[in-house]
């Protein structure tokens, strides 16, 4: 599924990634069924897998380390979100493990520019070649948006969290929509070439408003695996974007 990224420039990779509006939080499923999930997602032409790497220090939870990235099939695009105390070390390990997209937390590193600059020089394998590492920055609900201004030229993805990492306290929908509007206003003409992502316990009811605002992608985990209906739920979520006119990525059965 990721062979189409082989040999593309960073700008071309970003444009292609922007046509995939769903990243599946694969760790939210039952791990014993992981092989089945991956087969189902591949059959659905769903290439983006989202992995939350938590170390129990940046936030209370502990999930997996960079080693897990390398255990997933190379055919997928591995979309890694770092919520760790040492983002520099984790970023290096994730590149070595084959992560295609790496998103850092704005609150988690005093040397963000250094880490992002280094990531901008890295490439990782895809089927039939390599692609540049795509860089992201993520913000907790209470983090001022303007912290991203100094690093805008060093990121391709801007991710807004709708929950506080590890605690589960969600933003009200109205506050989330207002935050998206504020981000778009802040970006202005610098919006071009950026993928805007919303992550954190979203519901389908929120999607129409977010899509109408112009976001590019959502991350969903538990909602997709609910009732052991990954295929049906994935199709249903993607269909929300299909209504909005973005049908590039959809298989004919969706």
Swiss-Prot record:
InterPro entries: Aldolase_TIM (IPR013785), Ribul_P_3_epim-like (IPR000056), RibuloseP-bd_barrel (IPR011060). Keywords: Cell membrane, Isomerase, Membrane, Metal-binding, Transmembrane, Transmembrane helix. Belongs to the ribulose-phosphate 3-epimerase family. It is a single-pass membrane protein. Binds 1 divalent metal cation per subunit. This is Putative epimerase LsrE. CDD domains: RPE. Its cofactor is a divalent metal cation. It is found in: Cell membrane. Its main location: membrane. It holds the Pfam family Ribul_P_3_epim. The chain crosses the membrane at residues 14-34. Substrate binds at residues 81, 166-169, 199-201, 221-222. The active site is at residues 52, 199. A divalent metal cation binds at residues 50, 52, 81, 199. It comes from the Bacteria. It comes from Salmonella typhi. SUPFAM superfamilies: Ribulose-phoshate binding barrel. Its EC number is 5.1.3.-.
